[in-house]
Amino acid sequence: PDDGETVYPDDDWVEDMDMTTSLRFYAEKLGKNIGVAAASYRYDFSQTNGEIGLVGEEFNMIVGENEMKFDATEPNQGEFNYGGSDAILWLSDRYEQVVRGHTLAWHQQVPSWVSSDGKKNNNNFSKRQLLDILKNHIFNVVGRYKGKITEWDVCNEVLDDDQSIVRSDPTAYKLRPSIWATYIGEEFIDSAFVWAHQADPDAKLYINEYGAEMVGKTKTEAYYNLVKRLKESGLAIEGCGLQCHFTTGELDTMKLEKNIRRYDNLGLKCIITELDIALADPTAEDALERQAKEYGAITRIFLRNENCSSMLVWGISDNHSWRKNAPLLFNHELKAKPAYYNVHAQLRKAVEQLSTGLESPKTDGKPSARLLRTVYYNIMGQEMTSPTGFRIERRFYDDGSIETIKTYK
């Protein structure tokens, strides 16, 4: 369920079905990034329609689905292959998009010369050798795209799924077994951030995780503990990513938003990096409507939290998703689904509110009045000095008019 405390009316995207404006049109007006995971190997770069067209028309941020992972960029030790990652950069130039790099240190899609399964140390590398391998990889890959890739997922999915340790120690977390964690130790995370920052001091650095989206889960708490530790260690960490691979019926918007906001209290961004929402029951009559409502609810959270600067969906169309049961915004024929139209509607309404809320509502033909000051009140009518959450705004204009609105931030 949505939290019920939103400035937007109930999900109503009917009028958006006749609109030709893109998602990025509104996102850019709001200073937000709406992004997509692209698979460059599927595209005909001579074309501008179809899936490649949607990638550029609808989204102002792009991330390679697989192109920048370890096995793709360094298939053999010291031999780097940038064909796929360069293709993502080419697309970003063509469509004027911000680029996310994904990912530098992960337990999956590790080349066989490092590990046969991401866990085994088949070649009996020493700790020092593994650190050198990781360092060389990061300096080469990040260095190649210095000044071109805006932000990187430095480490991906480092936590074990079993975080029962949090129940006995609320500040604890447990790393998953991997070639990096088992044979180097936790310092591989810190080292990776240090090296990525050295390779490109201007790049924004993130850690990324799944299953840690909503407060109350042990993995969510463990992730918070780890991210807090990294921040307090003085590392150049911009924020954390929540993958948000959901199935309809799983989402609790209040718990998701509470999680995002507590990272803001740490001075960190908390962004949505791999959003998709699979249908719990594709045969249900209201399956697509339920999916649309959840996409809309997440979009509202994205829009009203300043530290959630980006929201990326993990793919374009249902037939090319890594998941079953139609989790994306476009169907197998590249037709927009209700989920797309509700994301569009929430972006549009946010822009409309932004553009109309800064002027006097008077329509008597006089020039718009200038806003003098805004006073915020909580739901009890008490003035707020640092407004967050549900609030009432009273806007005072130089023509004597006063506008009172309810909003959520």
Language model region names:
Residues 8-61, 65:
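Boundary/entry segment of secreted carbohydrate-active catalytic domains
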Residues 37-49, 70-83, 159-161, 212-222, ...:
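Acidic-and-aromatic substrate-binding clefts and catalytic sites of carbohydrate-active enzymes
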Residues 40-57, 132-141, 218-230, 256-259, ...:
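Short, acidic/polar
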Residues 81-98, 181-209, 216-283, 296-309, ...:
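Glycoside hydrolase catalytic-domain groove-lining segments
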Residues 2-7, 352-383:
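Residue-level detector of functionally pivotal "anchor" positions at catalytic/ligand-binding pockets or at interdomain
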Residues 23-24, 57-75, 83-212, 279:
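Substrate-binding cleft and catalytic face of glycoside hydrolase catalytic domains
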Residues 391-409:
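C-terminal tail/sorting-segment detector
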Residues 18-22, 112, 144, 153, ...:
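Aromatic-rich peripheral "rim/lid" segments of glycoside hydrolase catalytic domains that contact
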